[in-house]
Amino acid sequence: DGDDGAMRTNKTSVAIDGDNYNFYFEKSGGNKGAGKTGEKDDKYYQSGKLVRAGSDEKYQVVQYVNVANTAEGYFKLDDADDFIAALPSSYHVDTDIKQANLDALGINKKLDDIQEIAVITRDVRNTDGTIEVKNGTDTDEFFLVNTSGKVIDSKSKNKDGNDYQFVVAKGGAILGYYVED
């Protein structure tokens, strides 16, 4: 039950202020008992704590940040606005409600039925120095998780607690989002 003072290892659930949280602590070696930061069993952990969407949010975008010698970790973004604000300058967001954007996200709705839309592309520098435009986010930078901490990596539409439908491509790239009227 955790109050015996024994070191915890592997996956474990810890009760903090009446709420249960899932953790992963290293099992062996010099880091035995240390909280894992990174991926384990298709889920991500920050300082041992499972990165998952809150029950009210249902789905949340997670940003991986790695600033040399300063910060490294996974940060949940509160909502679609925070997600767009966190995108680096190499990303582009088209928010025009037009048929091309509905098609880009695979939405079979009438334009009048869409209240808000965002289609995400990014510039990627090729080895020869040319710039290629790719659809969606880099999965090493941004990914979508559900309330159990599972990374959404299949082609799907996932509605968060604010009625934003996040569109994810096979492989986990976030292509954008939309809100229906």
Give the ranges of each region predicted by the language model:
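Extracellular adhesion/carbohydrate-binding repeat motifs centered on closely spaced tryptophans
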Residues: 1-181
